[in-house]
Amino acid sequence: MRKVAIVGIGHTVFGNLSDFDLVDIMSFASANALDDADLLKERKIIEQVFVANMGGGIINHQTGIASALVSRMDLEPAMAELVENGPASGSSALKCGFAAIACGLVDVAMVTGGELMRTVTGWKGTDFVSTLLHPEVEYNYGLTLPAFGHVYPPLYGALRVNRAGTGPGSC
């Protein structure tokens, strides 16, 4: 197995980005990561792009996100692959990128991800998020993601306000 390194990181600015589409937002973060790695001008060395996204098809009515990102960033002929694994899509995409390099499939891969949920109402967004739970085990028994969030503090001795970054011990 070959050694693998993450050579750049990037993200969008924080705040309301509803003036941009999903691929724009992923492009901003990806360009930021490539710039951090000093590879923006040499981006054609990227052989495969792994895109983490769980809601593009439902929320944004766009399923060809990975190939759209490759085109938007002028990365052709890089292979494009969408990785959807619910709330674990990001870590799954990173695992795929790691494996592609480690096994020798590619020498250079880019992993990116993003969600754009401001295009729907709060109720539609909430309904979408509820689909992330296991339909036969969690959702049918009334478990919700906020309910899981309430379990966290007592189990790990954390203050509830720490999750929002507003209380003692927040960064």
Regions found by a protein language model. Name each.
Residues 1-87, 96, 159-171:
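Conserved active-site "lid/cap" helical segment
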Residues 5, 17, 56-108, 119-155:
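Conserved catalytic cysteine-centered active-site region
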Residues 7-8, 109-115:
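Short beta-strand segments
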